[in-house]
């Protein structure tokens, strides 16, 4: 099983052992740690949306890509890795994810629940896989240095 398959199943709520892969820490985080914090954020975000029962969700909190654990970790390393293409790609994909989630919140807050659900089911998993690919590439490059 590769990381993309593991992430896709994990986002569906399945408990599966992390695949043997890059076992390296960057700023105190392993690849598994980074992916698990992303999965946790997505899971908590979905729970808030369901629990809201149609009440407005916090748009600013969702859009803030520096407030989640993964985003805080990325921001803490920005000055160190900002010139690395793999880091910039990862940073951008993470920001894209939060922007997409914010657009879904806007749909939800405007009572366009079906559109929000469709977007959440199609866009967020794809962007999560992009983040997984970007994280893996970043870790591999850093490990070689």
Where are these regions (language model features)?
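N-terminal membrane-sensor/transducer module of prokaryotic signaling receptors
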Residues: 1-145
């Amino acid at each position: 099983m590769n990381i993309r398959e593991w992430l896709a199943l994990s986002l569906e709520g399945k408990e599966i052992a992390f695949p043997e892969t890059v076992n390296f820490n960057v700023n105190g985080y392993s690849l598994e740690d980074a992916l698990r914090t992303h999965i946790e954020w997505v899971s908590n975000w979905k729970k808030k949306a369901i629990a809201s029962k149609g009440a407005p969700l916090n748009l600013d909190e969702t859009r803030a890509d520096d407030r989640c654990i993964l985003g805080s970790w990325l921001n803490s390393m920005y000055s160190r890795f900002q010139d690395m293409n793999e880091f910039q790609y990862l940073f951008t994909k993470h920001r894209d994810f939060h922007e997409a989630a914010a657009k879904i919140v806007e749909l939800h807050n405007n009572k366009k629940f079906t559109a929000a659900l469709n977007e959440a089911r199609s866009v967020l998993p794809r962007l999560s896989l992009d983040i997984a690919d970007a994280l893996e590439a970043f870790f591999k490059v850093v490990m070689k240095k």
